[in-house]
Amino acid sequence: MRGVWALAVALGLAWGQGGDYAARCARLYAQGALEAAQATCELGLVVAPQDREVLRLLVRIHLDKGEVAQAQAYLDRLGEDPEAPYLRARALLAEGRYREVLALGLEGTEGRLLRALALERLGRLEEALALARGLPLDREVRLLLGRLYLELGRPLEGVAYLGDTPEEVVLKGRLLLAGGRLAEAASLLEEVRSRLSPESPLYREALAALVLARFGRLDGQGGFSVLGELAQVENLPGLG
């Protein structure tokens, strides 16, 4: 086994000194595939232990997974990296220290995004939306805009921003549901659940929205069928 590992490391060294791992990890992260992105980045660190792009990505991945301590360990390894203040702000967001994020006064595209996220968590939705508009539409910004329009009671305005990653499709289904477009919501949610693991919180979120879409369309049989599936993965009052 050790020989196989050594060969894999040697091939990685020959392949690209970590840079290719960073690019692959970044692509997986952009697609929302956090586990695959993490595994790829960790292999990249074996090849190039101080690769800053890999370290930055690992901080983001662990924060997205709610693993603040692990993120902090990688953040400490970055030292005085130019992106470190923004990543520290993300750690503050993960810890619920939203006003501290605003107090940092971070500028630029990333700074605007972080301030918008803090404002969202503080319930200052219109201010968050004003900051989020005009940002480059990567996955995180698309999701933020979708959530803001949902929370502001203008769900259909958020639909056009969302892409086709599983998290975005589930949110799009919720927006369509809230906007009364039940057939479209049910179709999207039915499709995306086949792409999700039953252990995923996103799977449960998709099922919960699909139940509402089915019952909203007066599809009692379909609604109870999905409700039964939901009861298998989540404790529901009065069921089981």
Identify what each model region corresponds to:
Residues 30-31, 64-65, 94, 121, ...:
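Register position in tetratricopeptide repeats
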Residues 2-8:
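Sec-dependent signal peptide recognition
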